Amino acid sequence: PDWLTAEELDHYIAEFTRTGFTGGLNWYRNMDRNWELTEHLAGATITAPALFLAGAADPVLGFMRPERATEVAVGPYRQVLLDGAGHWVQQERPQEVNAALIDFLRGLELQ
């Protein structure tokens, strides 16, 4: 992809060659256990300010249904979808991600 330079790709290849990808795979292997460990949170709401920031072309959005976030995010909530960005939005569009984060944080009131 145009957002990943050859140098960055070489870095990832070197690191995964050195360390393997067990950590990343274990996240998926442990998914059922994660649901079990967080079962007590079913129905809980988020009252702290929350920002949902994603790429509008992220295929995960198809089953995640971010439009339902306001059912659980009952405090101040903002959603930002970056057009044309995919799953790795922070790598694909770092300046826009940082700008959205800073804008969100600046809008918070200190308590």
Q: What residue ranges belong to the model's regions?
A:
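Solvent-exposed, non-transmembrane amphipathic alpha-helical segments
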Residues: 32, 44, 48, 70, ...
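Conserved loop-alpha-helix segment in the C-terminal half of the alpha/beta-hydrolase fold
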Residues: 43-44, 51-85
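Catalytic active-site module of serine/aspartate enzymes centered on a nucleophile-bearing elbow/loop
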Residues: 75-111
